[in-house]
Design a protein with these regions (language model features):
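A glycine-rich phosphate-binding loop feature that marks nucleotide/adenosyl-phosphate handling sites
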Residues: 174-178, 358, 393-395
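Short, well-ordered, mixed-charge alpha-helical segments that flank or form enzyme active sites
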Residues: 244-246, 272-275, 363-367, 396-399
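Alpha/beta catalytic barrel-like cores
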Residues: 1-343
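Catalytic or ion-translocation cores adjacent to nucleophile or general acid/base/metal-coordination motifs
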Residues: 258-268, 275-277, 379-402
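Gly/Pro-rich turn-and-neighbor structural signature
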Residues: 325-391, 400-404
């Protein structure tokens, strides 16, 4: 990881703000992407008699030695390494190491979380310390929305351990619930997000935690309680990733913040809500002929018919005109997810992610033909879909015909 890369993971502004206002991780986790706000204070404490909480279940081995997780009274965390005999202590693993007579301590920064993921997945491809897309997670899963953070993590881990089954153990809508960029939050630039289920707009990041912070805390919890030793794969869903509309300008930040998510929900509702379908049969045919590659049109038509659906040519052109702008933007976002992960993660396991196609925040019901065309295009465009969420016609707090 070079110096340019580390600037991406510089959260000094939010860490300074939290420290200056005595907002410590112990009582308010997951605001900062880092799980160590004051490394100087932490290391100064090591010079005396360290009063650290040691999480014995967090231990694991790598080629460098034995690692474990420790925490000070403010909630700042560190990775502690007992170096194996014969290992050169100048090895490049995590950053900002502080050496004592017995151990080397590294701050639990988000940058070091990236480094640790690479270190573990390179040395042990079967590790389940981090969210992945493997096992049956792409076929059947249960998404657990994370609303209570510290209460949530241990409860879900306990359930998975008893079931012997991996789940989508952390699920949040971003940027609606989690803060997509802590610097934008500090600058007062967070916007509002449509929330049709309750019939209004809501503030961005209204849960008050960053997507990176929630990711970090969820992973650390699995080390603390020893879940990483159980051999159970689990996933993290970045839910309702908005595609298009006013969210175009922040998509690079969404991509960066969700780099650990092994399950991405592509919410095409914002772009579809703004798309205007040509009115005449001729105009629809002209749009498709001009905008959509002919081989893609033919391949999509074949997939739709193989699903037992036979829209007329005009109906098919209308559907293509409706969904094509959103699918193009989805492809751009998908490529950005893949490129960002390839840049920062060193294994295929670390880069892979599941995809969900979502349009469930549009009013009304999604027709089978609309769903089929969108799925056909997604697969033909190199974006295999694992889950789909069509609009199902139910909106919270809005009268329904049979609601007596």
């Amino acid at each position: 990881m070079n110096s340019c890369d580390t600037k991406i993971f510089d959260y000094s502004s939010i860490n300074s703000f939290l420290s200056e206002n005595s907002i410590w991780i112990k009582n308010n986790p997951c605001i900062s992407p880092d799980f160590c706000l004051d490394w100087v204070r932490f290391t100064e404490g090591l010079n005396g008699t360290p009063k650290l909480t040691e999480y014995s279940r967090s231990s694991f081995f790598s080629d460098y030695g034995e690692w474990s997780l420790v925490e000070d009274r403010w909630g700042d965390h560190a990775w502690r390494l007992r170096v194996s005999d014969g290992i050169n202590e100048d090895f490049e693993s995590l950053s900002n190491g502080f050496e004592t007579e017995e151990y080397i301590y590294f701050p639990a920064s988000f940058e070091n979380l990236v480094r640790l993921k690479n270190l573990l997945q390179e040395s042990d491809p079967e590790t389940n310390a981090f969210p992945t897309s493997r096992a049956n997670l792409g076929k059947s899963t249960l998404g657990i929305g994370a609303r209570f953070t510290t209460l949530h993590w241990d409860g879900v881990d306990w359930a998975m351990s008893r079931l012997g089954m991996g789940l989508t153990a952390n699920q949040n809508s971003i940027p609606r619930e989690l803060v997509y960029d802590v610097n934008e939050m500090l600058a007062g630039n967070l916007d509002t997000v449509p929330f049709p289920f309750i019939g209004c707009d809501v503030p961005e990041g209204h849960q008050g935690q960053s997507v990176e912070g929630m990711t970090h805390g969820c992973i650390l919890a699995k080390f603390k309680n020893g879940f990483h030793k159980l051999g159970i794969s689990w996933s993290f869903n970045a839910d309702h990733q908005p595609i298009g509309g006013k969210f175009d300008k922040r998509e690079d930040q969404l991509v960066a913040g969700c780099m650990f998510a092994s399950y991405i929900t592509f919410d095409l509702s914002p772009e579809l809500a703004e798309t205007v379908i040509p009115e005449s049969e001729e105009a629809k045919a002209c749009f498709v002929d001009k905008e959509v590659p002919h081989d893609l049109v033919d391949a999509a038509r074949k997939r739709v018919e193989n699903a037992g659906l036979y829209p007329s040519e005009d109906e098919f052109n209308g559907l293509l005109a409706y969904v094509w702008p959103a699918l193009q933007k989805m492809k751009v976002r998908d490529d950005k997810y893949k490129c960002f992960r390839k840049k920062h993660f060193s294994t295929d396991l670390g880069c892979d992610f599941l995809r969900e196609l979502s349009i469930d925040e549009l009013p009304g019901l999604t027709t089978p033909e609309t769903t089929a065309v969108m799925l056909a295009l997604s697969f033909e465009m190199g974006m295999p879909i694992h889950f789909v969420a069509p609009a199902f016609g139910f909106q919270k707090n809005i009268p329904y015909p049979d609601n007596h």
